[in-house]
């Protein structure tokens, strides 16, 4: 009923948006920068905090331990974990993931933490093993 009263507007992701209005965050340069460097993401220097919060809320950007990743980087990390587990079914180490991702421990640990928390991997002592949501390699 509200949209009838407001005329040319639709509800998208819980927000009222005028029809024909471009999404100002659709092609945000920070998301592009994160996607261009998936495993060594840049810091959000100069990114408006409100825009950053909205990008995280929408799922375009994932924050883990203060590091921001493109959603596509998380998917890529899950595929990398699957490939590592194809080679080492008993589990892979943090070091193996870090070397395969070409990044540092600073960026590896938040990625692995996210994969563990979403069921892609599970931590067993010093290795990561397949979780129930591990994708195909």
Where are these regions (language model features)?
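C-terminal non-catalytic scaffold/interaction domains in large multidomain proteins
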Residues: 1-137
């Amino acid at each position: 009923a509200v949209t009838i009263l407001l005329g040319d507007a639709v509800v998208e992701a819980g927000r009222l948006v005028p029809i024909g209005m471009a999404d100002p965050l659709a092609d945000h340069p920070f998301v592009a920068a994160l996607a261009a460097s998936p495993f060594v993401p840049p810091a959000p220097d100069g990114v408006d905090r409100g825009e950053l919060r909205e990008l995280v809320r929408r799922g375009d950007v994932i924050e883990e331990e203060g590091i921001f990743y493109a959603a596509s980087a998380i998917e890529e990390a899950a595929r990398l974990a699957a490939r590592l587990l194809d080679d080492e079914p008993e589990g892979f180490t943090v070091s193996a993931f870090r070397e395969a991702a070409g990044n540092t421990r600073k960026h590896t640990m938040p990625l692995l933490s996210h994969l563990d928390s979403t069921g892609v991997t599970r931590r067993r002592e010093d290795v990561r093993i397949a979780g129930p949501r591990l994708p195909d390699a």
